[in-house]
């Protein structure tokens, strides 16, 4: 999405049929990086439904199943006769081969997992500008044993004779690897070839057009009614606030609930930024003592989360009744939430069809049904990176657009064990030093998250010739693309030394700083 369309009635140029792959969402993101609008739909979508949608191309995702298994997920076989170009990825390729008369079996030799050099047999069409010998990411235990009539080999690897195949006259293509993952060095070239040259798509999924359409749709939906938004200061709710302000002006009211677990200076910054600098109506709700009193004596992290979430709902309900009435509730629901709620009925462990599980998403924590709000969700077809682009176009500063992720329960889950005012003040000061030093070093935007954690133990130290017995602070810095996996960040020794020295000298109650060098997996980014 560049700065030059939106959900609304826009039809997807590319439809991704999801067979339970962990990469289905990533395929959609990669297609959108070419400025072509894509949607993820269930593998069970019928050929008639696709005909009505009239996409210019269809991509079949990978998946955990085997196409020859009794309960394997199968697409409508009439899809092959729609005259729409199809690209099958991994399981999607095997399904195409199987349904059109070929044969797929369990690999008799080595299964392929990881990187493999691609040897190209036909460098035209799908593989134009894909370098011979380029690395592609493999993840399959089954292999094609016989191609259907009309198909030809485009490329192979050492262990996979048919790594890429095509039926040119019917515009049917398959690849045994995953071009969408970052490890596939020329994967985007292949995706662009399919999207632009084979499907004939135009790059019209742009930020400017999205904003114009979203503003029009919000105005049409809301009319002259009032809208309430729970503002957290994160990029999603901030972008939504700017978009709604542009669309409906003073009909928007934002509610900022300060539960006492935010970072140092954050509540003041957010109120100054939204209310005073940009004249967005923000109601500040100081609920600090109410929240912390509810956590008295609570040490279990899940119980802490539950208490904070429940109390948030109660405060939100009370204050919305006081400030209302409101007809609409604005939520920063994103496309990954929509995909997860829709659910693909594939068991990720067995690869078999199972009953669909529906999961609801509420950015304000699961609102009571009797609030009777109608929902406004203009961001529900955007991925996180697209939200950031929209935010920039609307005038959000980089300090919010590129703000590090921050958990909903805030510092309450970065204090292990019971949360007290003393611990909160200690952690706020330490966390501020971490962020200040990383910004000063020019590394803030190079790191996915950087923060401090306070442990519920004390250690012995010596300061000013006197014995100390104080808390340790854990420094947690990770690098990641999407938060699903992460590696610990290798910070310069000089930076680590400055952070440690400042914390033990400036933060009362701390005498030791330790570094967390655990990746995700096996660890998680947050400690609780």
Swiss-Prot record:
Q: In which pathway does it act?
A: Purine metabolism; GMP biosynthesis; GMP from XMP (L-Gln route): step 1/1
Q: Which GO terms describe its cellular component?
A: cytosol
Q: Which InterPro entries match?
A: Class_I_gatase-like (IPR029062), GATASE (IPR017926), GMP_synth_C (IPR001674), GMP_synth_GATase (IPR004739), GMP_synthase (IPR022955), GMPS_ATP_PPase_dom (IPR025777), NAD/GMP_synthase (IPR022310), Rossmann-like_a/b/a_fold (IPR014729)
Q: Which residues form the active site?
A: 90 (nucleophile), 178, 180
**Has the keyword Iron-sulfur been applied to this entry?**
no
Q: Which reaction does it catalyse?
A: XMP + L-glutamine + ATP + H2O = GMP + L-glutamate + AMP + diphosphate + 2 H(+)
Kindly report, in one word, the top-level EC class recorded for this enzyme. Answer: ligase
- Which residue range or ranges hold the GMPS ATP-PPase domain? 205-403
Q: State which Enzyme Commission number(s) the record gives.
A: 6.3.5.2
Keywords linked to the UniProt accession: ATP-binding, Glutamine amidotransferase, GMP biosynthesis, Ligase, Nucleotide-binding, Purine biosynthesis
Instruction: Answer yes or no on keyword Cell division.
Output: no
Residue ranges of the Glutamine amidotransferase type-1 domain? Answer: 13-204
The UniProt record gives the binding positions of ATP as 232-238
SUPFAM superfamilies reported in the protein's UniProt record: Adenine nucleotide alpha hydrolases-like, Class I glutamine amidotransferase-like, GMP synthetase C-terminal dimerisation domain
One example of the protein's molecular function in GO is: GMP synthase activity
Give the quaternary structure. Answer: Homodimer.
Q: What does this protein do?
A: Catalyzes the synthesis of GMP from XMP.
Please state what the protein is called: GMP synthase [glutamine-hydrolyzing]
Species assigned in the record: Prochlorococcus marinus (strain MIT 9303)
Q: Which gene encodes it?
A: guaA
């Amino acid at each position: 999405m560049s700065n030059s369309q939106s959900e609304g009635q826009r039809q997807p140029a590319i439809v991704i049929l999801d067979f339970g792959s962990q990469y289905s969402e990533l395929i959609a993101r990669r297609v959108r990086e070419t400025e072509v609008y894509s949607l993820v739909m269930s593998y069970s979508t019928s050929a008639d439904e696709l005909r009505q949608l009239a996409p210019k191309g269809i991509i079949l995702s990978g998946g955990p199943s085997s196409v020859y298994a009794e309960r394997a997920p199968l697409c409508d076989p009439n899809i092959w006769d729609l005259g729409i170009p199809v690209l099958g990825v991994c399981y999607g390729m095997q399904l195409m081969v199987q349904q059109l008369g070929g044969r797929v079996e369990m690999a008799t030799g080595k299964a392929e997992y990881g990187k493999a050099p691609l040897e190209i047999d036909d460098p035209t069409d799908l593989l134009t500008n894909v370098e011979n010998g380029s690395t592609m990411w493999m993840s399959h235990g089954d292999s094609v044993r016989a191609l259907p009539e009309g198909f030809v080999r485009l490329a192979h690897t050492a262990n996979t004779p048919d790594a890429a195949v095509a039926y040119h006259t019917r515009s049917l293509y398959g690849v045994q690897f995953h071009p969408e993952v970052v490890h596939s060095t020329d994967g985007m070239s292949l995706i662009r070839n399919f999207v632009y040259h084979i499907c004939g798509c135009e790059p019209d999924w742009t930020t400017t057009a999205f904003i114009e359409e979203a503003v029009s749709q919000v105005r049409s939906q809301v009319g002259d009614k009032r809208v309430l938004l729970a503002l957290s200061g994160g990029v999603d709710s901030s972008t939504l606030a700017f978009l709604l302000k542009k669309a409906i002006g003073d009909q928007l009211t934002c509610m900022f609930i300060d539960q006492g677990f935010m970072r140092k200076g954050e509540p003041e910054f957010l109120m100054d930024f939204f209310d005073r600098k940009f004249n967005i109506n923000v109601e500040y709700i100081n609920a600090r003592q109410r929240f912390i009193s509810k956590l008295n004596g609570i040490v279990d992290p899940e119980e802490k989360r539950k208490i904070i979430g429940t109390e948030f709902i109660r405060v939100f309900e009370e204050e919305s009744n006081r400030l209302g009435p409101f007809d609409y509730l604005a939520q920063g629901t994103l496309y990954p939430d929509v995909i997860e709620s829709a659910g693909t009925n594939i068991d990720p462990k067995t690869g078999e069809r199972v009953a669909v599980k529906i999961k609801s998403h509420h950015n304000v924590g699961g609102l009571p049904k009797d609030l009777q709000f109608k929902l406004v969700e203009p961001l529900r077809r955007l991925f996180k990176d697209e939200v950031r682009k929209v935010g920039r176009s609307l005038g959000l500063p980089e300090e919010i657009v590129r703000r590090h992720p921050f958990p909903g329960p805030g510092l309450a889950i970065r204090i292990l064990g019971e949360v007290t005012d003393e611990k909160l003040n200690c952690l706020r000061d330490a966390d501020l030093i971490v962020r200040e030093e990383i910004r000063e070093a020019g590394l803030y935007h190079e790191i996915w998250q950087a923060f401090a954690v306070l442990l519920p133990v004390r250690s012995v130290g010596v300061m000013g010739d006197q014995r100390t017995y104080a808390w340790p602070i854990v420094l947690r810095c990770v690098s990641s693309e999407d938060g699903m996996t992460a590696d610990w960040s290798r910070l310069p020794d000089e930076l680590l030394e400055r952070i440690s020295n400042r914390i033990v000298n400036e933060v009362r109650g701390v005498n030791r700083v330790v570094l967390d060098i655990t990746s995700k997996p096996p660890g998680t980014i947050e400690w609780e």
